[in-house]
Regions:
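Short metal-coordination and nucleic-acid-contact micro-motifs, chiefly zinc-binding Cys/His arrays
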Residues: 77-80, 101
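Interaction interfaces in information-processing and related assembly proteins
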Residues: 1-78
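Cys/His-enriched microdomains
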Residues: 82-85, 103
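Cysteine-rich micro-motifs
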Residues: 99-111
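Short functional micro-motifs and their immediate structural scaffolds
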Residues: 91-92, 110
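Short amphipathic alpha-helical surface micro-motifs
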Residues: 64, 87-88
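Short, non-ligating residues that shape and space the ligands of small metal-coordination modules
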Residues: 93-97
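Short, cysteine/histidine-rich loop/knuckle motifs that typically chelate Zn2+
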Residues: 86-87, 107
Length: 112
């Protein structure tokens, strides 16, 4: 599978997951709206709030993953794929093989 195909597959998978997670989160919020329970005094309330927060966290990570893969596809189209966004040097092929959506070379990634 080519890098482009791999990135396109990652964008598609993340988009599907994002849609599913959004639906789950919306359903959870809607269900809690129908319930008049007070989370603070309901023994299940903190669990529901925790689950909602966990789901929102996974949704945000999925959005970032999709965005990173789309950014890499845009770089491919622009002819700048594989160039570190911080220092401008080439990103090692091994790093791109491990993380096709890498924006930074190893040295810049280590520096944070």
């Amino acid at each position: 599978m080519s890098t482009r195909e791999e990135l396109e597959a990652k964008v598609a998978a993340a988009t599907r997951l994002e849609t599913s997670l959004r639906q789950q989160l919306d359903a959870m919020v809607e269900a809690s709206r129908d319930d008049n329970a007070d989370d603070e005094h309901d023994p299940e309330g903190s669990t529901i709030a925790f689950e909602r927060q966990q789901l929102a966290s996974v949704l945000e990570r999925t959005r970032r993953s999709r965005s990173d893969a789309q950014h890499a596809l845009d770089q491919l189209a622009a002819g700048t794929y594989g160039t570190c966004e911080r220092c401008g040097r080439p990103i090692a092929p091994e790093r791109l093989e491990a993380r096709p959506d890498a924006r930074l070379c190893i040295e810049c990634a280590r520096r944070g």
